[in-house]
Amino acid sequence: MNFKYIVAVSFLIASGYARSEENDVQSLSQREVLEEESLREIRGIGGALLSAGKSALKGLAKGLVEHFANGKRTAEDHEVMKRLKAVMRDLDSLDHPEEASERETRGFNQEEIANLFTKKEKRILGPVLSLVGSALGGLIKKIG
C-alpha cells in the first residue's frame, strides 16, 4: 500500500513539475513576442520622429533660403544660402533614396544600402543643425 502511495505522489509531483516547465516556456515565448513587438513600435516611433525632423529641417531651410533670396546679401549670406540649397538637395535625396546616386548603390545588398543612407543622414544632420543654428543666430542678431 505504501508503494502505491509513493508512486502516486511521485507521479503527481512529476506532472506538476512538467506543467510548470511548460508554463515557463510559454511565458518566455510570450515575453519574447512582446519584446519584439515593443522593439518594432520603438523603431516605428523613431522612424516617424526622424521623418518629422527631416521635414521640419527642410521647411526651416526653405524659409531661410527664401529670406536670404529676397533681401540684400553680404558675401557671408550668399555662402549660407548656397549651403542651405545644398542641404535641401541632400535632404531631398534622403527622401528619395532610389533616385539618389544610383552609381553609389549599384552592386550592394540591401543592408549595405541602408548603412550608406544612415551614414549619409548622420553626415548631413550635424552640419545642418550647426548651419541652421548659425543662420538663426545671425537673424536674431539682425532683428535685435
UniProtKB/Swiss-Prot annotation:
Subcellular location: Secreted
Modification sites for Asparagine amide: 70
GO BP annotations listed: defense response to bacterium; defense response to fungus; killing of cells of another organism
Chief localisation class: secreted
GO cellular component: extracellular region
Keyword annotations from UniProtKB, A to Z: Amidation, Amphibian defense peptide, Antibiotic, Antimicrobial, Cleavage on pair of basic residues, Cytolysis, Fungicide, Hemolysis, Secreted, Signal
Modification Isoleucine amide, positions: 143
Signal peptide start and end residues: 1-18
Superkingdom per UniProt: Eukaryota
Tissue expression per record: Expressed by the skin glands.
Pfam families: Bombinin
InterPro entries (UniProt xref): Bombinin
Record propeptide residues: 19-43, 74-123
Family: Belongs to the bombinin family.
Function according to Swiss-Prot or TrEMBL: Maximin-z shows antimicrobial activity against bacteria and against the fungus C.albicans. It has little hemolytic activity.
Record's protein name: Maximins z/Hv
Species of the source: Bombina maxima (Giant fire-bellied toad)
